[in-house]
Amino acid sequence: GTFLYQDGMRESVEQFKYEGMKEYAKGYAALMAHFEGEWAERWENPFLVPVPIHKRRYQERGYNQAAELAKALSVRMGLPVWEGLARTRNTAPLQQMSAAQRRRSLEGAFGILDERSWPRGTAILIDDIYTSGSTVEACARAMRQRRPEQMVVFWTLTIRAELT
């Protein structure tokens, strides 16, 4: 993660995620590109893959914060975005779960929606918060089930402070 998920950054990310402040994505993307953009560009044919949310959660929020972040990073860095990964099963909110509970909850929760448009290259999963790794692992697993050779890395806006 580019930043620790604590104090003011935590408040800001919660506004971005839960309070409709999707315009924050542009500022976050500028900071992510400034601090870690060279890392993202070093991969072979990198493309951005936002971690999907379930359609019910999308209806509640009106947007997917990871997709907003990926689109803003795409504009800033010129990297393509592929939104062919889908959340096929709605899961309970993960915030209060242990790492083991998160892993169990996310088993089989992702799938490939659009294989035809799937680029060749390194998939960079984009998300707002890295907590236990369960979400990015489940996304990578879904991608590798369909394309075993797929290189998958992740780039998050924040990482929970207790993990550093």
Describe the predicted segments one by one:
Residues 37-46, 78, 113-122:
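Short, glycine- and charge-enriched coil/turn segments that flank and shape catalytic ligand pockets
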Residues 82-164:
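PRPP/pyrophosphate-binding module of the type I phosphoribosyltransferase fold
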